[in-house]
C-alpha cells in the first residue's frame, strides 16, 4: 500500500482530492482525519501542512506527495518530481512599491526583502550577484513594505490582485509553480508498480479534460463521408448495428468543436 501526503486544507487540498477521485481513487474525507484509506485503490492519504510534505516524503513517512513545486524548491531535499499535475498554477516573484522606479536587479542591492521562501530567494540573489537583506516572515508578507518591515517582498503571486491591493507591483518572476507529484525514490518494486498505475490514471484524467464522447448511428453508405468530417483523437470506431445497412460511429473529440 502506498501512502500519499497531501495538503490538509485549502484549494490545493480540494484539487488534489478531486484529481484522486477522477482517477478512480475514492477517499472519504467527510470526517477529515490525519490519515484515511481509499476504498477503491491500495493507498492511504496523509493530511499535512504543505511545507511539511517534502520532508515527510524525504524521510519515508509518506511514499508520495502532492504539493506545490514552490515547496519542493524551498524545502525539497532529496525528493524528485515524478509528475506535473496541471493545477495550482502560481509563481514566486519579487515585488516593490508601485511608486518606485525599477531599473533592474541592481535595485535590490542593500534593500530589505521580506519572504517565506528564503532559500529560493537567497539562491536567486547569489546567482545574480545581488546583496540584499532577507527578512523571513511566516505570513502576510505583502504588508511588510507598508508597515516598514521591508523595502520589497518575494512571495507567491496568482492573479496579482493581492499585490495591487497592497500598493505593490511585480518586477521579477523567479519560479513558476504548479502542483506536482513527488517521490523519495526508495520505493519497493510493488510500490513502484502502484506509482506507475497512479501516473497512468492521472495522465488519463488530464487527457480526457476538454473532450467529449461522440456517438452517432449512420447509414453504411455515409460512413466514409462522416469519417472525413468528424474530428477524432485518432480514427473513429465503427460498429455494425442489428439493423442491416446501419452502423454506429464512436469518436472522442475536443469539446470546442461541438
Give short role names for the model-derived ranges.
Residues 48, 62, 66-67, 154-157:
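Short beta-strand and adjacent tight-turn residues that come in two discontinuous sequence segments
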Residues 56, 61-64, 106, 163:
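Short glycine- and Lys/Arg-enriched binding-loop motifs that mark or flank ligand-binding interfaces
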Residues 1-42, 69-80, 85-91, 98-258:
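Small-molecule-sensing regulatory modules
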Residues 42-61:
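Short, structured active-site "lid" loops
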Amino acid at each position: 500500500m502506498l501512502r500519499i501526503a497531501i495538503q490538509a486544507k485549502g484549494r490545493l487540498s480540494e484539487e488534489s482530492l478531486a484529481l484522486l477521485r477522477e482517477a478512480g481513487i475514492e477517499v472519504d474525507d467527510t470526517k477529515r482525519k490525519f490519515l484515511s484509506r481509499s476504498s477503491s485503490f491500495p493507498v492511504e492519504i496523509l493530511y499535512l501542512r504543505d511545507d511539511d510534505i517534502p520532508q515527510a516524503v524525504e524521510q519515508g513517512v509518506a511514499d508520495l506527495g502532492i504539493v506545490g513545486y514552490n515547496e519542493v524548491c524551498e524545502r525539497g531535499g532529496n525528493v524528485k518530481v515524478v509528475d506535473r499535475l496541471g493545477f495550482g498554477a502560481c509563481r514566486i516573484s519579487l515585488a516593490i512599491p508601485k511608486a518606485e522606479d525599477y531599473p533592474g536587479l541592481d535595485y535590490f542591492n542593500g534593500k530589505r526583502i521580506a519572504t517565506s521562501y528564503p532559500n529560493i530567494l537567497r539562491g536567486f540573489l547569489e546567482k545574480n550577484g545581488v546583496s540584499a537583506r532577507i527578512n523571513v516572515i511566516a505570513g502576510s508578507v505583502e504588508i511588510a513594505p507598508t508597515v516598514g518591515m521591508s523595502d520589497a517582498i518575494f512571495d507567491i503571486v496568482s492573479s496579482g490582485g493581492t499585490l495591487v491591493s497592497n500598493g505593490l507591483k511585480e518586477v521579477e518572476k523567479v519560479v513558476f509553480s504548479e502542483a506536482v507529484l513527488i517521490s523519495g525514490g526508495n520505493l519497493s518494486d510493488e510500490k513502484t508498480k502502484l506509482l506507475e498505475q497512479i501516473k497512468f490514471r492521472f495522465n488519463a484524467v488530464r487527457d480526457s479534460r476538454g473532450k467529449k464522447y461522440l456517438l452517432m448511428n449512420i447509414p453504411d453508405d455515409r460512413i466514409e463521408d462522416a469519417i472525413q468530417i468528424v474530428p477524432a483523437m485518432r480514427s473513429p470506431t465503427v460498429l455494425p448495428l442489428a439493423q442491416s445497412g446501419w452502423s454506429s460511429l464512436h469518436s472522442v473529440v475536443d469539446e470546442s468543436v461541438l
